[in-house]
Amino acid sequence: HQMTRQSNQQALAILDQMGISYDIYQLQGEDKSGQKDALLVAVDVKEAAQHLGKKEANDPMFIAAMTALDKGQIDPVTEQLLLGTINKQIPTSTTVVPLNGPINVSSRDPQKATIMPKTLRTLTVENAEQVHPVAGTKYQTYAASSRLLYADGNVQTPLYANAAFVLKPGKPVLYVGITTDVQRDYFKPIFDNAFKSIK
């Protein structure tokens, strides 16, 4: 479980760096192959949007989005526009995303103006699912999942993430379930059912 703990801490460090507060839950289960564990992170979307969107506070699109978050409802036309825009950003083939890259520093010598980090960190996104509405939920809910490979130098950690955006009026929440890729088949139905039954 050392590997899982380490990769979970790295995922949470990203949220910490962004200044986003979150709740975290540990899920445990067992089957014939042994003990299983996963993390479930819950982010208050309204609070995060206000924190990250300070510059856009007067932007009409930002105001409209915040109003939708308050109402807990997105009309069908806006939903199609949003899903279209979001899904265009989701890689359709295996994609490597650099998490840290060259650092630009001021220098008279252009050869020395870039410093490469000692350890390159990347996240490979594979089999990413399009964001889609979830039927049979109390609140409007959208979900997506993906297999991920987190690489930190020579260490690679295969992960699985399953996310749901639940539009609870006044308190919309983004839930992200994270587990190791080998536990994906065990946790996928658990995550899916949990996201459907949020009250």
Show the residue positions of the predicted features.
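Surface-exposed amphipathic alpha-helical segments
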Residues: 1-3, 168-199
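Short acidic, Gly/Pro-enriched loop/turn segments at secondary-structure junctions
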Residues: 2-13
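Short beta-strand-to-coil "C-cap" segments at the C-terminal boundary of structured domains/repeats
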Residues: 6, 43-48, 196-199
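Signature of long, low-cysteine stretches enriched in small and polar/charged residues
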Residues: 14-16, 21-23, 29-164
